[in-house]
Design a protein with these regions (language model features):
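Aromatic-anchored transmembrane helix interface
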Residues: 122-147
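Alpha-helical transmembrane segments of multi-pass inner-membrane proteins
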Residues: 2-7, 14, 21-36, 69-83, ...
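Canonical alpha-helical transmembrane segments
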Residues: 60-63, 75-89
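Juxtamembrane membrane-water interface segments that cap and precede transmembrane helices
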Residues: 45-63, 118-121, 197-212
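Interfacial helix-loop-helix linkers and transmembrane-helix boundary segments
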Residues: 89-94, 149-158
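Interfacial loop-to-helix junctions that mark the boundaries of transmembrane helices
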Residues: 50-69, 91-96, 125-129
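Membrane-interfacial, low-structure loops and terminal tails that flank and connect transmembrane helices
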Residues: 1-16, 88-94
Length: 267
């Protein structure tokens, strides 16, 4: 009986480890990648175009490394699906609703290959680091979530990490709302710039929230996606202190939304 109990405990531990490894890329997409902010200097490759009036060299803080991370996560997801299907012999699940998404991914790749400016299709362009790999990655992420998030336990584990990421983002946003922007502090600048750390000039006025999302308008999209989830959790969670926490996060994001002056989110 004792042996059976120990074996049962070991099996549960192994299942938990496998569960964490499976939801890890989803956690990265929901909670980690949105926070990535770091300086990246690059050549625009646009100087040959008559319509471009900017400098040949530019700097990015909010998009490039998010792009790299998302591509890595997408590759991880593909490998994880292959392992689960062939290594663990899980049943491959498919739904006809994904056919349009698969067609979109294929057309996107063909379009990138056929483009006269394929360099930008595969590497991204000035202030728009969204190459074809990212567009195809969105399709991979959508299917992976459909394949993995199929039971209540997995969803609960994922939401916990998602809430952690939202909490960090809300804390950063509140610092911007109350004109104590963490990214403008000495420590914040050291975290987002390579040595030697330089003093940065921000395009957004002090008191306007932008989180780590490049454009204050993106704050509107972020808030309108997250707030309904938090409100739903307020009404479905049993523990009182959880409800209070979710309500506080929802209220914080609404405040951050108005501070961002994002018409997209308010509308």
């Amino acid at each position: 009986m004792a042996v059976y109990t120990n074996l049962n405990k070991n099996l549960k531990k192994n299942e938990k480890k496998v569960s964490i490894s499976i939801i890890l890329p989803i956690i990265a997409v929901l909670a980690v990648i949105p926070l990535i902010t770091y300086k990246y200097e690059y050549y625009t490759h646009l100087e040959t175009f008559d319509w471009y009036r900017g400098r040949p060299q530019a700097a990015d803080f909010f998009l490039h490394y998010k792009t790299i991370a998302l591509i890595i996560v997408s590759i991880y997801m593909v490998l994880a699906i292959i392992y689960m299907v062939w290594g663990e012999e899980r049943k491959f699940v498919w739904d006809k609703k994904f056919i349009p998404l698969a067609v979109y991914a294929v057309i996107t790749l063909v379009s990138a290959i056929a483009s006269k400016n394929s360099y930008f299709s595969f590497n991204g362009i000035y202030e728009q680091f969204e190459p074809v790999w990212i567009l195809m990655g969105y399709a991979v992420i959508a299917y992976y979530c459909f394949y993995v998030l199929r039971d209540e336990t997995t969803v609960k584990h994922t939401i916990r990490w998602f809430i952690a990421g939202i909490s960090v983002m809300a804390a950063l946003g509140l610092s911007q709302v109350f004109k104590c922007d963490f990214l403008r502090s000495d420590l914040g600048m050291k975290l987002i710039t390579p040595p030697p750390h330089e003093k940065l000039t921000f395009n957004f006025e002090l008191g306007r929230s932008y989180l780590t999302l490049y454009n204050p308008n993106y704050v509107g999209y972020y808030a309108t996606l997250i707030v309904p989830l938090l409100i739903a959790l307020v009404f479905t969670t049993k523990k009182l202190w959880h409800r209070i926490g979710y309500a506080f996060l929802a209220a914080s994001l609404v405040l951050i939304l108005f501070s961002s002056q994002s018409r997209a989110g308010i509308v």
